[in-house]
């Protein structure tokens, strides 16, 4: 089955109306949630980062609403990050100055799962070969 990975900044932008990428983030998350885009994996590290950020910036209610919406969505699939991805991510982190540790773990998971497409507004991923970053609600498998 075709799958993509979604970065924290997409989910955060969709939930915070003041975010500069709010409209694009909302369009992407709604298309995923409605099944117009492939299943989107959300790694547990990413989920924690999103919920913690939203709680700090938007309040507890928006954090809880987001958590529940992601869990209940048929378009998003929450994935526990295995230790092997964290270990591989540490190696990726050492190689790419443009990536945070969480971003590097995303890369490691994508490499392990052989997933090419990532919805993200972070251009730091552009330096990683084998990953195609998407910033609009387009289905990469229907090109």
Positions of PLM-derived features:
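Amphipathic alpha-helical interaction elements
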Residues: 13-17, 55, 59, 94, ...
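Helix-adjacent hinge/juxtasegments
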Residues: 52-79
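Active-site neighborhoods of divalent-metal-dependent phosphate/nucleic-acid chemistry enzymes
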Residues: 78-116
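Metal-dependent nucleic-acid phosphoesterase active-site entry motif
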Residues: 1-20
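Short active-site oxyanion
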Residues: 36-40, 75-77, 114-116
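A general alpha-helix detector
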Residues: 10-11, 49-50, 88
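PIN/NYN-family metal-dependent endoribonuclease catalytic core
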Residues: 3-6, 28-57, 80
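Acidic, PIN/NYN-like endoribonuclease modules and their adjacent C-terminal/linker elements
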Residues: 3, 114-143
């Amino acid at each position: 089955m075709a799958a993509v990975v979604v970065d924290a900044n997409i989910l955060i932008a969709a939930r915070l109306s003041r975010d500069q990428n709010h409209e694009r983030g909302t369009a992407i998350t709604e298309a995923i949630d409605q099944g117009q885009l492939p299943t989107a994996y959300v790694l547990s590290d990413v989920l924690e980062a999103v919920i913690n950020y939203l709680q700090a910036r938007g309040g507890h209610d928006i954090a809880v609403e987001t958590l529940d919406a992601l869990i209940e969505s048929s378009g998003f699939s929450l994935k526990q990050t295995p230790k092997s991805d964290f270990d591989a991510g540490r190696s990726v982190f050492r190689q790419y100055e443009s990536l945070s540790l969480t971003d590097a773990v995303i890369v490691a998971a994508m490499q392990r799962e052989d997933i090419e497409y990532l919805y993200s507004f972070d251009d730091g991923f552009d330096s990683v070969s084998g990953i195609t970053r998407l910033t609009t609600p387009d289905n990469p498998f229907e090109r």
